[in-house]
């Protein structure tokens, strides 16, 4: 639990939640800070970097997003606050960001273009990318997810340092990095090692769960851009942070309240790791809409390809599936009345063109393929099922409610206890996801930040400032699952229960001994 002194407050009055009320400290310490406090949202599909600083005139924290220089494949330079988490080897040069992302249609995944590698961290498989052109013979190697992450952060660090120098900021950079709340120990370890390789010094306490970072950012912005959160007298509001990105569906349930020490925020539960993200929606569309249609247009049958080649073809269809999904979501978001899909009277069609994929049967080509809103509605039924996931054609697809229900159960709450739902991540802007959650949690207030993709990085930069400058952690991380040992009698002994604040006090176990054989 994180509980920080507020000082005196008026009993009986509702309290407006703010960063200063959560992190009461001597803010004068931040004046003339001898560092630049950077937060990195290392996303599966998009990475965003922000920095926070103390504004003495306004006596408040301010956040700005850092624009990142990116080279296009033709050598042209551009700047953007959103950096695609993509690396490509093209024309003997390594591209990171938009230039690499634009080559998804041309290059082969894990051979000369790498993306979605974040979710492969923690896999102890050695050189996983067997076809990688950046192999052991090259000075820069990408043979697994940790290699790719290291190369990505090498580029990112250079761009951050260039921005800091150009802006005349303090070159002593203090970092915080956001991670999925459900990231397991081996995934966190690989990330920290990839950062360390590039001399990005991030302690475990400087990592912040993405839902918690989103919470901090929303609280900072709510006075100006969003619905402010108040704590009524005697009430401890509960917030479900729904972070649905390209590679993860992260749930964090927070309690906000006031005790004798002041305002506090604490995690009640976080979701366990489930293989679910917006990429899985793309995968379903590719397997069940695009691949069958591609076969029909080329006069082929599903039996014409073995599973390994089918997977390779589908991998090349993923970028087109993503384009269809994003296009459909944008079209519906323009015309629906918030959270009510029944207002959509007409059918919409989104089209992708000029698909060419090499195969053992020759080049598979399509001048045009499409997806209708009726088809997309059927796709989204798979991911909003209340009864669990689906297995179709050997592919497993999880539902958002697996993570949501397990988090609510672990928190000891019921659905009626959830006061707020905060949407974070690009996939949370999917209208079918929002409509489903509104129907399932009809009495909860739904909170939408101004920019779901920048929000987490801003929260990470706030954490960088609060933690690195003041030594405070506003929302302490907790264990998502219990840590147990199996005893000699095959009994399960819990060492650290789920939901335990980390770092925790010393836990004493006096009924456990190591047996000595012989």
Annotate each predicted stretch with a short phrase.
Residues 1-129, 206, 277, 284, ...:
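Early-domain small/polar-rich strand-loop-helix modules and first-structured segments
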Residues 2-12, 16-18, 31, 44, ...:
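Acidic, glycine/GT-rich loop-and beta-edge segments that sit at the periphery of enzyme/chaperone cores
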Residues 49-51, 57-74, 80, 220-294:
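Glycine-rich phosphate-binding loop of actin/hexokinase-like ATP-binding domains
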Residues 199-213, 434-461:
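Conserved phosphate-binding/catalytic loops in two-lobed NTP-binding clefts
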């Amino acid at each position: 639990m994180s509980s920080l002194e507020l000082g005196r407050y008026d009993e009986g009055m509702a309290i407006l939640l703010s960063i200063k009320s959560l992190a009461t400290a001597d803010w004068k310490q931040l004046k003339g800070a001898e560092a630049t406090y950077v937060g990195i949202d290392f996303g599966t599909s998009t990475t965003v970097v922000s920095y926070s600083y103390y504004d003495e005139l306004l006596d408040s924290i301010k956040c700005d997003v850092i624009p990142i220089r990116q080279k296009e494949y033709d050598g042209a330079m551009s700047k953007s606050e959103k950096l695609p988490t993509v690396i490509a080897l093209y024309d003997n040069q390594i591209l990171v960001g938009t230039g690499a992302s634009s080559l998804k249609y041309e290059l082969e995944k894990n051979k000369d273009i790498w993306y979605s590698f974040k979710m492969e961290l923690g896999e102890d498989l050695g050189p996983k990318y067997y076809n990688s052109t950046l192999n052991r013979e090259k000075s820069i190697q990408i043979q697994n997810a940790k290699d790719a992450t290291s190369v990505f952060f090498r580029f990112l660090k250079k761009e951050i340092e260039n921005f800091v120098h150009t802006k005349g900021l303090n070159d002593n950079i203090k970092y915080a990095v956001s991670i999925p709340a459900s990231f397991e120990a081996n995934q966190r370890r690989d990330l920290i090692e990839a950062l360390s390789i590039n001399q990005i010094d991030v302690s475990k306490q400087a990592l912040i769960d993405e839902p918690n970072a989103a919470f901090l950012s929303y609280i900072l912005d709510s006075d100006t851009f969003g619905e402010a959160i108040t704590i009524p007298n005697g009430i401890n509001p509960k917030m479900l942070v729904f972070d649905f990105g390209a590679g993860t569906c992260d749930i964090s349930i927070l309690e906000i309240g006031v005790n004798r020490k002041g305002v506090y925020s604490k995690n009640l539960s976080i979701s366990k790791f489930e293989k679910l993200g917006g990429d899985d929606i793309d995968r379903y569309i590719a397997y069940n809409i695009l691949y069958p249609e591609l076969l029909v247009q080329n006069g082929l049958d599903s039996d014409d390809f073995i599973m390994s080649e089918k997977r390779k073809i589908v991998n090349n269809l993923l970028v087109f599936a993503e384009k269809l999904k994003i296009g459909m979501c944008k079209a519906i978001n323009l015309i629906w009345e918030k959270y009510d899909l029944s207002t959509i009277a007409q059918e919409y069609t989104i089209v992708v063109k000029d698909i060419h994929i090499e195969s053992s049967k020759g080049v598979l080509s399509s001048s045009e393929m499409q997806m209708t809103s009726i088809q997309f509605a059927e796709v989204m039924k798979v991911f909003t099922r209340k009864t669990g996931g689906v297995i179709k054609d050997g592919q497993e697809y999880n539902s958002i409610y697996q993570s949501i229900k397990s988090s609510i159960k672990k928190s000891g709450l019921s659905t009626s206890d959830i006061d707020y739902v905060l949407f974070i991540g690009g996939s949370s802007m999917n209208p079918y996801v929002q409509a489903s959650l509104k129907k399932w949690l009809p009495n909860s207030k739904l909170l939408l930040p101004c920019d779901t993709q920048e929000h987490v990085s801003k929260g990470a930069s706030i954490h960088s400032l609060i933690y690195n400058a003041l030594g405070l952690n506003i929302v302490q991380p907790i264990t998502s699952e219990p840590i147990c040992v199996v005893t000699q009698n095959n009994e399960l002994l819990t060492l650290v229960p789920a939901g335990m604040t980390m770092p925790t006090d010393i836990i004493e176990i006096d009924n456990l001994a190591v047996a000595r054989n012989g």
